[in-house]
C-alpha cells in the first residue's frame, strides 16, 4: 500500500500529524474500510433503523466536521471515501486540536480522545469509559505502527515509479 504511505506522508508534511497516529486513527475508526458506516440502531432489537451518526469512510468523519474541513482547507472536492482526503482530514484535525486544546501532535491517547469526543466535549472524557478504552487501544496501535514504520521507512521512502 505504497500510495497510502505516500498520502499519509504528505499529510504529515502539511499538518505535522505523525503518520503512525493517522493510521492508528483509521484502524480504530474504520479498520481501513473505505465505505465504513456505523451500524444501524435496531427497533425492537430486530428491525434496522437509523444510524447513530453521519460518520462515513476511512476517517469516520461526521458531516458537520467534514464540511468545516472542506471550507477551511478549500478542498471542495474532498470525499470521505478517498484515503488521500481522509488522512488529510485527520492531519487537519490533529493540527487544529493542538491549536485549540494544546495537545501535542504525537500524543496518540489524548489526540484520539479529542477526535472521538470532539473539541467541545473533550473536557468531559473522564466520564466516558468507552472513550478511554478506545484511546488506550489507539495509543497501543500507534506505538506498534511507529515501530513498524521505523523498520520500513527506507523502503517506503524510495520512489516506486520509474519515469522514462
Question: Where do the PLM segments sit?
Answer:
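Catalytic glycan-binding domains that act on GlcNAc-containing polysaccharides
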Residues: 1-159
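Short, solvent-exposed mixed-charge patches
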Residues: 163-164
Amino acid at each position: 500500500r505504497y500510495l497510502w504511505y505516500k498520502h499519509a506522508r504528505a499529510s504529515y508534511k502539511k499538518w505535522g500529524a505523525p503518520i503512525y497516529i493517522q493510521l492508528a486513527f483509521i484502524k480504530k475508526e474504520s479498520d481501513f474500510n473505505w465505505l465504513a458506516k456505523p451500524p444501524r440502531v435496531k427497533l425492537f432489537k430486530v428491525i434496522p433503523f437509523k444510524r447513530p451518526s453521519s460518520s462515513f469512510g476511512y476517517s469516520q468523519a461526521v458531516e458537520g466536521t467534514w464540511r468545516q474541513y472542506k471550507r477551511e482547507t478549500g478542498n471542495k472536492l474532498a470525499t470521505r471515501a478517498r484515503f488521500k482526503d481522509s488522512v488529510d482530514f485527520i492531519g487537519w484535525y490533529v493540527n487544529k486540536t493542538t491549536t485549540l486544546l494544546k495537545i501535542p501532535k504525537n500524543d496518540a491517547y489524548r489526540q484520539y480522545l479529542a477526535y472521538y469526543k470532539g473539541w467541545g466535549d473533550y473536557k468531559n472524557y473522564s466520564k466516558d469509559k468507552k472513550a478511554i478504552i478506545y484511546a488506550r487501544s489507539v495509543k497501543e496501535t500507534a506505538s506498534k505502527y511507529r515501530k513498524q514504520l521505523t523498520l520500513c521507512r527506507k523502503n517506503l521512502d524510495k520512489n516506486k515509479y520509474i519515469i522514462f
